[in-house]
Amino acid sequence: MAPTFQTALFFTIISLSFAAPNAKQVRWCAISDLEQKKCNDLVGSCNVPDITLVCVLRSSTEDCMTAIKDGQADAMFLDSGEVYEASKDPYNLKPIIAEPYSSNRDLQKCLKERQQALAKKMIGHYIPQCDEKGNYQPQQCHGSTGHCWCVNAMGEKISGTNTPPGQTRATCERHELPKCLKERQVALGGDEKVLGRFVPQCDEKGNYEPQQFHGSTGYSWCVNAIGEEIAGTKTPPGKIPATCQKHDLVTTCHYAVAMVKKSSAFQFNQLKGKRSCHSGVSKTDGWKALVTVLVEKKLLSWDGPAKESIQRAMSKFFSVSCIPGATQTNLCKQCKGEEGKNCKNSHDEPYYGNYGAFRCLKEDMGDVAFLRSTALSDEHSEVYELLCPDNTRKPLNKYKECNLGTVPAGTVVTRKISDKTEDINNFLMEAQKRQCKLFSSAHGKDLMFDDSTLQLALLSSEVDAFLYLGVKLFHAMKALTGDAHLPSKNKVRWCTINKLEKMKCDDWSAVSGGAIACTEASCPKGCVKQILKGEADAVKLEVQYMYEALMCGLLPAVEEYHNKDDFGPCKTPGSPYTDFGTLRAVALVKKSNKDINWNNIKGKKSCHTGVGDIAGWVIPVSLIRRQNDNSDIDSFFGESCAPGSDTKSNLCKLCIGDPKNSAANTKCSLSDKEAYYGNQGAFRCLVEKGDVAFVPHTVVFENTDGKNPAVWAKNLKSEDFELLCLDGSRAPVSNYKSCKLSGIPPPAIVTREESISDVVRIVANQQSLYGRKGFEKDMFQLFSSNKGNNLLFNDNTQCLITFDRQPKDIMEDYFGKPYYTTVYGASRSAMSSELISACTIKHC
């Protein structure tokens, strides 16, 4: 057994032997002996309660990805280019923690100054002390001199508080943060994290940036010195923002650059035939960004991966190279690793990584080095400079003006389906709080993480490689590897959300003449992600999923039309219509309960279809909060049944679980195991216990006048119920069009913007064949489901109508201003989700 593996095994056994019998473990995969040494240092020095770090050694990035896939390790850090490769078969890994960078500054000023001080490694140097949120500790002490003093929120020394060692220290008070930073911290954390909440942008002094941007809605606006919006500056997404002031925003991106010696004289368009040094073949900054620019500028002769691998093409472009991880002999000739380790995609190759690429250039093994801007140092500016794609050269500190593009920071990855994600997150967040040496090491540069890292940030659980990298970069990487396949303009790949839908879709595909193909996801969100990635083209979504889809950039192409009393729009496209025939959300009461109206429902007993449902929860809750200063719904009603709520809360008191199986403990379950769940359940709740039920208007007609034979419903009459109107009056249930809480927008077929015309054309053709009046409706029916209900389309759909896009904000255009104002006006975060958080990552 080799000594390095004996050492690795020893440390692994030691770390396991000291772990408690039931202690949780995070097995970190190290790609080299140097990374293993750093990992073992952390095992001994970074003690996180209840979670043990275990180091697993493999010989390369690819071997570590395999180990994680096979369950032999749990996590590793990858460059953004490697994240793409890891996301594919056979690895199927996903990013869970991001590594944000700061180009000039970071909002956590204390963390930045601390990192800079640690990087200098100067004996006797003052190192700021920061709290777990990245703020300055009120009292600062110099580790070498022993002097202590008080600071304000911005880290500035407070006059008269300096005390030498041995004397009683001044009492330091925690100073109030500037208003912007305080609001930012509340938005980002606090006791109650709300996804989609607006997070203010602050400058390094804690003042409001002149231009503010809402990460979820895409709106931007200008503010004054105290953060108040300046009238007339609000700009919707897709429009050019108002000019407030030039900014240098904090970014989670870095720059890919080309570094050369000043003594050389060639320009970017003269790279062919030169000797090259690269950080690695899987790296974005040292390889993929360069290839993309060379192809775009037509400097590289390459007919695509179908005819020739990109490595083969690049081996003919450069004379010789060192590209760790490459398979072409010519691309490894300049590497200097020992036998068996030469050109390895790990630190075992001395020229691996950003600092390795620089070393390759420095040792005159190459004419140009392709690496990341964070590896640049002012101390090299006398000898080196940047090679710019516009055929100029610039100083090293001008990397923002002279680069090959911006690319995302790397991430920590684990298995897509893993029970270790929470442990990994908890370990790294706690290690960060305890100021463990995650981001530096005496053993070398960029081990486990990049040395330029200031902090780690958890990603939304919905984030995958596509959502993290963004559309442009993801598809660029697919093109380089031959994974890209342009969708056909004559075929729609329809996404189905369950097995029954897939069966119906397959039947449709068989008679479509090749116009329809079928994909399958496990839920509507899965279909949204498939369409975003280009793996599917269309899906029909109910309104509760439309907000997420629109926030993620999809657009409605076609809408369902349900009004069977007016078939005109189906016969003649473009005919005017005012009623889609869709549902209305109503507040239903017993006619005998004369004293209740909309204005006095506080304290009453309420029945809801389920938490998150549009008619039974989102609309009534949004209205109540708007009209009652954001009242807490838990305490607004006397008692409720809102399936899906905390079982100990007031919102579950009226629920009864499963009357046929009281031992099942399903009270308040968001499923039919709660008798009061869903539309029928909420109506039953009203009949048996409640004062008001929030339901779609059709519920009363479907469960009265002999329509429902159940014991609790068989004798009910529709005339025994009334509607509560928002003006305080009441009305018969037949007046649902005028006495409602809100209309509900129709379901829509969504797709990518560039695919709208193709989807509309193909769907119109299929409807002419298999719609209600279709020529071939005896062969197949779009709006009928003999294997279930409402499959692919709602069964009461009369026809599909092209969405009439108006030149306004897409949210108001689809939802309609009344609905949009009702649901989102009071709190835009009301419908936020992990998917929206993932979709609204600011990409490079």
UniProtKB/Swiss-Prot annotation:
Which Pfam families does the protein's record reference? Answer: Thyroglobulin_1, Transferrin
- Which residues are in the Transferrin-like domain? 26-106, 245-482, 492-828
Q: Which residues form the signal peptide?
A: 1-19
Print the keywords alphabetically: Disulfide bond, Repeat, Secreted, Signal
| Protein's UniProt keywords contain Lyase | no
Q: Where is this region: Absent in transferrins?
A: 109-249
Tissue expression, as annotated, is: Plasma. Highest levels of transcripts found in the liver, the lung, the pancreas and the brain.
Q: Sorted alphabetically, which CDD domains does this protein's record hold?
A: TY
Biological process, per Gene Ontology: antibacterial humoral response; iron ion transport
Question: What PROSITE patterns does this protein's entry cite?
Answer: THYROGLOBULIN_1_1 (PS00484), THYROGLOBULIN_1_2 (PS51162), TRANSFERRIN_LIKE_4 (PS51408)
The cysteines joined by S-S bonds are C29-C64, C39-C55, C110-C130, C141-C148, C150-C172, C180-C202, C222-C244, C277-C360, C322-C335, C332-C343, C388-C402, C495-C527, C505-C518, C552-C839, C570-C799, C607-C685, C641-C655, C652-C668, C725-C739
Q: Into which family does the record put it?
A: Belongs to the transferrin family.
The protein depicted here goes by the name Saxiphilin
Q: State the organism of origin.
A: Aquarana catesbeiana
The record lists the lineage as: Eukaryota, Metazoa, Chordata, Craniata, Vertebrata
